[in-house]
């Protein structure tokens, strides 16, 4: 309709300008649909598996989890699409992403609309190009907004990050909200059980495996490699995506031990941890003596939802939504729309670092 109005309004004007403007509209629409975040998902099968001895890891349906952690380059796409004017709604950009050596994203109010945010030039303290390093200095709420935006089709609208899998309504602190019930597929942060199964469960068996690595970042092609150790080793920050090519979980995911701590959407329910997200993995800064506390048999660890450090990031999941208690049948156009929405293609990631494992005696 915009093109029709333009043609009608300018019919007495320069016909070349009319054609140019019409073509600009077409190109703009094609550009928006062609660009964006593309997630490399790994399918986690074996639905209905049993839990580990700690009660974690049982998942009733198949789901998909990003093979790698979310990188700076993808978060930049999100920032520019959501915030073309550079007003930073609900603090989705943390200034330390630009000022801290571990952060990988810069902001310039003087830049063109839709290009206010960019991947930082150069490399991080681990000599990793910033675009390939996991995004850090993100709160749980910023990570939740990222997945809401993905699930809503990567729209150029700040409203698209406030509702979806999580109803945020401009919330930036406090207890994390639960996933919304619904139908079809949701883009989400993984739950405790989804993350745990993808990291440790051996498909088709009754075993949960231990991820075990070295802390020497030069050994990127050996088995059982991971990025941890902090300042005591050369691991001075997150490493390049896809570095540990021979170290994966049983399902083939990377960096589920070390590199960055990862948020889940499972909230604590006891004492000080009520409403705080459970986290996994450990990070590049986790001391060698403490990395075992982040493995298969570790106790539950929680972080504040507003925590934003150079050690914490996230990865994306695609899961089956939990049905609402009573869903009225749809008909006609409403049903058609529901089918289209449920089948929307959700895309987003590239490649990243890795891990490894060793069988323990955690038989069910």
Model-derived segments and spans:
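Short, Lys/Arg-enriched N-terminal segments with co-localized hydrophobic residues
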Residues: 1-16
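Sec-dependent signal peptide recognition
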Residues: 18-25, 327-330
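N-terminal signal peptide c-region/cleavage motif recognized by signal peptidases
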Residues: 31-33
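Disulfide-stabilized, aromatic/cysteine-rich ligand-recognition loop
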Residues: 35-36, 246-249, 272-322
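A short glycine-rich, aromatic-capped structural motif
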Residues: 37-108, 134-151, 258
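Functional-site microenvironments in short loops/helix caps that host divalent-cation chemistry
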Residues: 140-293
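C-terminal membrane-anchoring or membrane-association module
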Residues: 339-363
């Amino acid at each position: 309709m915009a093109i029709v109005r333009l043609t009608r309004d300018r019919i007495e004007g320069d016909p070349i300008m009319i054609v140019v403007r019409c073509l600009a509209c077409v190109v703009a629409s094609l550009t928006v649909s062609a660009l964006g975040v593309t997630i490399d998902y790994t399918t986690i099968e074996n639905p209905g598996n049993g839990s580990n001895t700690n009660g974690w890891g049982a998942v009733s349906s198949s789901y998909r989890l990003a093979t790698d952690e979310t990188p700076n380059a993808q978060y930049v796409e999100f920032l520019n699409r959501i915030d073309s004017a550079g007003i930073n709604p609900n603090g989705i950009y943390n200034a330390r992403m630009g000022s801290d050596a571990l952060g990988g994203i810069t902001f310039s109010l003087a830049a063109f609309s839709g290009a206010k945010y960019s991947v930082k030039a150069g490399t991080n303290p681990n000599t990793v190009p910033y675009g390939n390093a996991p995004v850090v200095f993100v709160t749980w709420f910023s990570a939740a907004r990222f997945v809401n935006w993905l699930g809503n089709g990567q729209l150029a609208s700040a409203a698209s990050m406030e509702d979806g899998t999580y109803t945020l309504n401009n919330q930036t602190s406090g207890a994390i909200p639960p996933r919304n019930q619904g139908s079809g597929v949701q883009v989400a942060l993984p739950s405790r059980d989804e993350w745990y199964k993808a990291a440790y469960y051996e498909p088709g068996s009754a075993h949960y495996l231990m991820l075990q690595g070295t802390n020497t970042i030069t050994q990127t092609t050996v088995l059982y490699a991971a990025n941890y150790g902090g300042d005591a080793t050369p691991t001075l920050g997150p490493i390049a995506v896809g570095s540990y090519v021979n170290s994966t979980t049983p399902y083939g995911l990377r960096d589920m031990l070390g590199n960055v701590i990862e948020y889940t959407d499972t909230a604590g329910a006891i004492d000080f941890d009520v409403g705080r997200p459970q986290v996994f993995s450990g990070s590049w800064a986790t001391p060698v003596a403490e990395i075992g506390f982040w493995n298969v048999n570790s106790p539950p660890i929680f972080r504040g939802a507003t925590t934003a450090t150079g050690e914490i990031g996230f990865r994306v999941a695609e899961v089956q939504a939990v049905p609402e208690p009573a869903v009225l049948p749809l008909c006609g156009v409403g049903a058609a729309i529901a089918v289209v929405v449920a089948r929307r293609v959700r895309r987003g990631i590239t490649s990243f670092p890795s891990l490894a494992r060793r069988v323990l005696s955690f038989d069910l």
